[in-house]
Design a protein with these regions (language model features):
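A general structural signal for short secondary-structure junctions and capping/turn motifs
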Residues: 2, 205-208
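Acidic, His- and aromatic-enriched active-site or binding-groove loops in soluble protein domains
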Residues: 83, 196-205
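A structural signal for short, well-ordered beta-strand segments and their strand-loop junctions
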Residues: 58-60, 177, 200
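Metal-dependent polysaccharide deacetylase catalytic core of the NodB/CE4 family, i.e.
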Residues: 21-38, 54, 69-79, 87-89, ...
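Terminal accessory/targeting
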Residues: 1-77, 96-106, 111-117, 121-122, ...
Length: 320
């Protein structure tokens, strides 16, 4: 009997170890001017009904973060909902539906817009009012393309933004979401230097117990998001050995990605190119390239055994 209980306990632990939570990222609500980042009230309710009917648990971002931080299990039925920018449409259109379902949120604030009371955005008074229903994080001061900023301007943006965030909210932000989803190691390092504990990307994918808290993937949530496909995504632990950043000469001569998966092949995709089947040796993919990169931002992904790892390369004009 003891052996059976031990075996069952091991099985349950193994299942949780392989589980994947999912973070969804919203922007605008009932705002047809911007279809690529908008979701209608009707569509939002349909998606929330799907979570409810399929037994998903919508949890605070902090619950997922603390589980990863403390080495605790991550559940396959966990869903986290984040809202970027702090548009007024969330306050007026989205929030009532979140409250109707009792779903918590994590709001990432574009500080300059809220502090200066830009017309399309929530004020800090409104953010403080709704804070009791969710969590509030940081989305930069000026919502700039951060990779394109020199060191001084990058640090100034963090210092100004975090200072004004703290002045208005009464605490320093724990979370940070990259503007436009664009980043490199330089931006990431400056964020960490300024006390950021958790960084959210816009690399569509899942989150597992061994995810990096400084690079949590999020799934874009808009009218066209197909929930069954999004919720089926699995996290692939991978080390992107080459290239580390956008190459200075605009050319990727070689790609090397290392995973822990015991697999002989996978599928690699890159912006502007067709998905290709690739070989893996001892969990490593090595791929030669000849063509130069013809755009300032490219997204790459490797899928192995149904799990996906994603990396974005953004041209840094300040790279030495």
């Amino acid at each position: 009997m003891k052996k059976l209980i031990s075996a069952l306990a091991f099985f349950v632990a193994a299942q949780f170890a392989l589980a994947d939570a999912h973070i969804f990222n919203y922007h605008r609500f009932d705002d047809d001017r911007h279809p690529s980042t908008n979701i209608s009230s009707k569509n939002l309710r349909e998606k929330f009904e799907y979570f409810k009917e399929k037994g998903y648990e919508v949890i605070p971002l902090s619950k997922l973060v603390d589980a990863i931080k403390n080495g605790e299990p991550v559940s396959d039925n966990w869903v986290v909902l984040t809202v970027d920018d702090g548009y007024k449409s969330f306050y007026e259109k989205g929030l009532p539906i979140f409250l109707e379902y009792g779903y918590p949120f994590a709001l990432m604030v574009y500080v300059e817009a809220s502090a200066r009371k830009y017309g399309d955005f929530m004020t800090f008074e409104q953010i403080k009012e709704i804070e009791k229903y969710g969590e509030v994080g940081y989305h930069s001061y000026g919502h700039l393309h951060m990779v394109g900023l020199n060191e001084e301007k990058l640090k100034n943006d963090f210092e100004d933004g975090i200072s004004k965030f703290e002045k208005n909210m009464g605490y320093k932000p724990r979370y940070f979401a990259y503007p436009f989803g664009e980043y490199n190691d330089r931006v990431r390092d400056v964020a960490i230097e300024h006390g950021i504990e958790v960084i959210l990307s816009q690399n569509s994918g899942a989150v597992a117990a061994d995810s990096d808290l400084h690079e949590l993937d999020r799934i874009p949530a808009m009218n066209g998001t197909h929930l069954p496909s999004a919720l089926a995504s699995k996290f692939l632990k991978a080390e992107w050995i080459l290239p580390q950043d956008y190459p200075k000469d605009n050319k990727i001569s070689e790609l090397i990605i290392k995973t822990d998966e015991n697999a002989t092949h996978g599928y690699f995709s890159m912006t502007g190119q067709k998905t290709k089947k690739v070989k893996l040796e001892n969990g490593q993919m090595t791929l030669k390239f000849n063509k130069p990169i013809d755009r300032y931002k490219v997204r790459m992904s490797l899928k192995v055994n149904g799990k996906t790892a994603t990396k974005i390369l953004v041209k840094d004009i300040n790279a030495e």
